[in-house]
């Protein structure tokens, strides 16, 4: 979840990575002691392409990589928190967005992700937590799409008269 969050945060800024850059960035983010070996390069490169294709899709069916509903709530909440932190890390790592480019809506979303990155304390879990979790994941999904399209708008060709 954290790696997907990082990648989507990075891509949302309009930045793209070469294969070599992605291999280096992902290995560093995951704190791998060695770079990706030959067997693991293909899946991580495929992950990049799949995520980019999904977030760019016209059908807006991008989904967050979360553990299944069969997992304990704490495990799912931890993954969601890691996704949100990853998004913020990737968004910042791109270095493409100046403070002047951050609208009020974008700032609000970034603040939400910051709050999400802290998760829900075990003491705060009750019968409404499951519903709240589902709503938070959907909110993150929709706002990730918003962020991507906000900073990745196609450049309009000037109209010649």
Residue positions per predicted region:
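Domain-length accessory/inserted modules outside core catalytic folds
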Residues: 1-161
């Amino acid at each position: 979840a954290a790696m997907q969050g990082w990648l989507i945060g990075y891509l949302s800024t309009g930045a793209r990575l070469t294969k070599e850059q992605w291999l280096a960035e992902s290995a560093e983010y995951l704190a791998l002691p060695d770079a990706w070996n030959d067997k693991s390069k293909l899946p991580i490169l495929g992950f990049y392409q799949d995520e980019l294709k999904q977030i760019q899709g016209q059908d807006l069916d991008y989904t967050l990589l979360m553990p299944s509903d069969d997992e304990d709530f704490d495990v799912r909440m931890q993954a969601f928190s890691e996704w949100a932190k990853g998004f913020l890390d990737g968004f910042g790592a791109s270095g493409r967005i100046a403070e002047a480019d951050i609208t009020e809506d974008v700032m609000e979303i970034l603040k939400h992700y910051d709050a999400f990155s802290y998760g829900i304390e075990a003491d705060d879990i009750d019968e409404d937590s499951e519903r709240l979790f589902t709503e938070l994941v959907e909110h993150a999904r929709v706002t990730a799409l918003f962020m991507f399209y906000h900073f990745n708008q196609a450049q309009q060709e000037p109209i010649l008269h």
